[in-house]
């Protein structure tokens, strides 16, 4: 417990909040070739590589991911949610924040049903997360 004198000399410092998705908080001025502070909920990007990755220790699977170059020229790894996808190199995707806990280095999700990404076929529940239209029946 500090004394009043200690607090007068050096007051308490508030914690600095670090962003969970730093690539979404930058814009790029291509004319000046400089980064600017520009917070966005999502960003557009182009897939440079689509592949699979194995998760961390207790889990076992082949998780689908894409390497994406965002509109601010930052390259990130983004998870492709849902069963099956139509992404390939040069596909244009929409990326949102949100990490995948068992994949190291994956801090972003691809939004299904937006731009070149199709929704998940045959999905009945939780459709909005997977970009699936309401079935006709």
From Swiss-Prot:
Superkingdom: Bacteria
Record GO biological process: translation
Gene3D superfamilies attached to this UniProt entry: Nucleic acid-binding proteins
Region (Disordered): 1-57, 118-137
Keyword vocabulary terms for this entry: Methylation, Ribonucleoprotein, Ribosomal protein, RNA-binding, rRNA-binding, tRNA-binding
This protein's record includes keyword Ribosomal protein: yes
GO molecular function, one term: rRNA binding
Modification 3-methylthioaspartic acid occurs at: 102
Signal peptide from the UniProt entry: none
A GO cellular-component term linked to this record: small ribosomal subunit
UniProt keyword RNA-binding present: yes
Similarity comment: Belongs to the universal ribosomal protein uS12 family.
Xref: NCBIfam families: rpsL_bact (TIGR00981)
Free-text function comment from the UniProt entry: With S4 and S5 plays an important role in translational accuracy. Interacts with and stabilizes bases of the 16S rRNA that are involved in tRNA selection in the A site and with the mRNA backbone. Located at the interface of the 30S and 50S subunits, it traverses the body of the 30S subunit contacting proteins on the other side and probably holding the rRNA structure together. The combined cluster of proteins S8, S12 and S17 appears to hold together the shoulder and platform of the 30S subunit.
Quaternary organization: Part of the 30S ribosomal subunit. Contacts proteins S8 and S17. May interact with IF1 in the 30S initiation complex.
Protein name: Small ribosomal subunit protein uS12
Organism from which the protein derives: Staphylococcus aureus (strain COL)
């Amino acid at each position: 417990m500090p004394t009043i004198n200690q607090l007068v000399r050096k007051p308490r410092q508030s914690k600095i909040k670090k962003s969970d998705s730093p690539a979404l908080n930058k814009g790029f001025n291509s004319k000046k070739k400089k980064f600017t502070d520009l917070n966005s909920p999502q960003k557009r990007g182009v897939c440079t590589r689509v592949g699979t990755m194995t998760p961390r220790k207790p889990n076992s699977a082949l998780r689908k991911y894409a390497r994406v170059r965002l509109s601010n020229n930052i390259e990130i790894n983004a998870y492709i949610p849902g069963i099956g996808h139509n992404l390939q190199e040069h596909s244009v995707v929409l990326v949102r924040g949100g990490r995948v806990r068992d994949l190291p280095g994956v801090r972003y999700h691809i939004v299904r049903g937006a731009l070149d990404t199709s929704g998940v076929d045959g999905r009945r529940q939780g459709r909005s997360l997977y970009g699936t239209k309401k079935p006709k029946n």
